[in-house]
C-alpha cells in the first residue's frame, strides 16, 4: 500500500508588506475585493472602494501600521513566521508552509511549496479559532480556485475551526492567569472578538455562536464568575449594523459606570496585529481611561507561545 505524505498549510489573513500608503493600498484592495468580506453589489462597491475608501484610508492606516511595526516587519507576519518555524520543528518530518489569504506569501505559493515536497495530503489549518464565512470560507474559496487548474489534486483536510478545542482553551486560560498574577485580578475580563455584519449571522453564519462557545469554555476553565466576564465585538466597518455590543462603546460605558480595572483579551486573533496592538491596546485603552477607568491591560495573543504551538500540533496529528 502506497504511503501518504502529509503537509500542513498554515493560513492567516495577511498584512501589508510595508507601513506605506502604497503597500497598504495594494493590501486593502485585495482584501476588500473579496466577496466573502464585502458582498455589496460590484457596481456599487467598485466605485466606492477605488474612488473613496482606498484613497482616503490607505494613508491613515499606513500611519497606524507604522506605529506598531517591528524591526523584523509586520507583527502578524513576524508571529506567523515564528509559528510556522515552531510547528515545523514540533512536527519533524511533516512539511509546513505559511500562506496568507491576502498579500504575501500567497496561498498559491504555499500550496506549490508543499507540492514541490511531494505532499499528497494537505491539512489546512486556518488560524481563525471561530469559523466565519468571511475568513475560513474565504480560504476554501481560494483553494478551490487555485486547484481548479491542476490535473492531479492532492487530498485536503480542511479544519473548520477549533473554538472549543481543550488545548486552545487551556492556552487561553494560561495566558489570562499569567496576566492576573502580574497585574492583579481585574474588576472585569473583557473578551473582544472581531465583528462581522449582523446580516451575515442572520443569513446563517454561526460565527457569533462559536464566539459564545469559546467564551463559555474559557470562563469554565478559569473558574471565575460569569458576571466578571464580558464579550464584545470590534473593528466594525461601514454603516450597516454589526454584531453587538461594540467594544469601543462598551469601554466608554464601563468607565462611566465606575469600573476601574479591566483586562482585555482577543481570543479570535491567533497573532497580534493592527487590530489588537493598535485598536485594542491603544485606542480602546484611551477610551476607557478618558471615561473614568484607571487600570487597563491588554493580554497578548497566543502568538508563538509553546502552548499554542502544542495545540496546533495536536490538531494536525489528529488528521495525519
Swiss-Prot record:
Provenance organism: Cronobacter sakazakii (strain ATCC BAA-894)
Reactions performed catalytically: heme b + 2 H(+) = protoporphyrin IX + Fe(2+)
Binding locations of Fe cation: 194, 275
Alphabetical list of Pfam families matching this protein: Ferrochelatase
Purpose of the protein: Catalyzes the ferrous insertion into protoporphyrin IX.
UniProt-recorded Gene Ontology molecular function terms: ferrochelatase activity; metal ion binding
Keywords assigned by UniProt, alphabetized: Cytoplasm, Heme biosynthesis, Iron, Lyase, Metal-binding, Porphyrin biosynthesis
Protein name: Ferrochelatase
Subcellular location: Cytoplasm
Pathway the protein contributes to: Porphyrin-containing compound metabolism; protoheme biosynthesis; protoheme from protoporphyrin-IX: step 1/1
EC number assigned by the record: 4.98.1.1
Domain of life (superkingdom): Bacteria
Name of encoding gene: hemH
Record's keyword annotation contains Cytoplasm: yes
Gene Ontology cellular component list: cytoplasm
Keyword Iron attributed: yes
GO BP terms: heme biosynthetic process
Family, per entry: Belongs to the ferrochelatase family.
InterPro entries: Ferrochelatase, Ferrochelatase_AS, Ferrochelatase_C, Ferrochelatase_N
Amino acid at each position: 500500500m502506497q504511503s501518504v505524505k502529509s503537509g500542513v498549510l498554515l493560513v492567516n489573513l495577511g498584512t501589508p508588506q510595508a507601513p506605506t500608503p502604497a503597500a497598504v493600498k495594494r493590501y486593502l484592495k485585495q482584501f476588500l475585493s473579496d466577496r466573502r468580506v464585502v458582498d455589496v453589489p460590484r457596481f456599487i462597491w467598485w466605485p466606492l472602494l477605488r474612488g473613496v475608501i482606498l484613497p482616503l484610508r490607505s494613508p491613515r492606516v499606513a500611519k497606524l501600521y507604522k506605529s506598531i511595526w517591528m524591526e523584523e516587519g509586520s507583527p502578524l507576519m513576524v508571529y506567523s513566521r515564528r509559528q510556522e518555524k515552531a510547528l515545523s520543528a514540533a512536527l519533524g518530518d511533516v512539511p509546513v508552509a505559511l500562506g496568507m489569504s491576502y498579500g504575501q506569501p500567497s496561498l498559491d505559493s504555499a500550496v506549490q511549496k508543499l507540492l514541490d515536497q511531494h505532499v499528497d495530503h494537505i491539512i489546512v489549518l486556518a488560524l481563525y479559532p471561530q469559523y466565519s464565512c468571511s475568513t475560513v470560507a474565504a480560504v476554501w474559496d481560494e483553494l478551490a480556485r487555485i486547484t481548479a487548474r491542476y490535473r492531479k489534486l492532492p487530498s485536503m483536510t480542511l479544519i473548520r475551526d477549533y473554538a472549543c478545542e481543550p488545548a486552545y482553551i487551556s492556552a487561553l486560560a494560561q495566558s489570562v492567569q499569567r496576566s492576573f498574577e502580574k497585574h492583579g485580578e481585574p474588576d472585569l475580563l473583557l473578551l473582544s472578538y472581531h465583528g462581522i455584519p449582523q446580516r451575515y449571522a442572520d443569513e446563517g453564519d454561526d460565527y457569533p455562536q462559536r464566539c459564545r462557545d469559546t467564551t463559555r469554555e474559557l470562563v469554565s476553565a478559569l473558574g471565575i464568575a460569569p458576571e466578571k466576564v464580558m464579550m464584545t465585538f470590534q473593528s466594525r466597518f461601514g454603516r450597516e449594523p454589526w454584531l453587538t455590543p461594540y467594544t469601543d462603546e462598551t469601554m466608554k460605558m464601563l468607565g462611566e459606570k465606575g469600573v476601574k480595572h479591566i483586562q482585555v483579551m482577543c481570543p479570535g486573533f491567533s497573532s497580534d496585529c493592527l487590530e489588537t496592538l493598535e485598536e485594542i491596546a491603544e485606542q480602546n485603552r484611551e477610551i476607557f481611561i478618558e471615561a473614568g477607568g484607571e487600570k487597563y491591560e491588554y493580554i497578548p495573543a497566543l502568538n508563538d507561545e509553546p502552548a499554542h504551538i502544542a495545540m496546533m500540533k495536536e490538531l494536525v496529528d489528529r488528521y495525519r
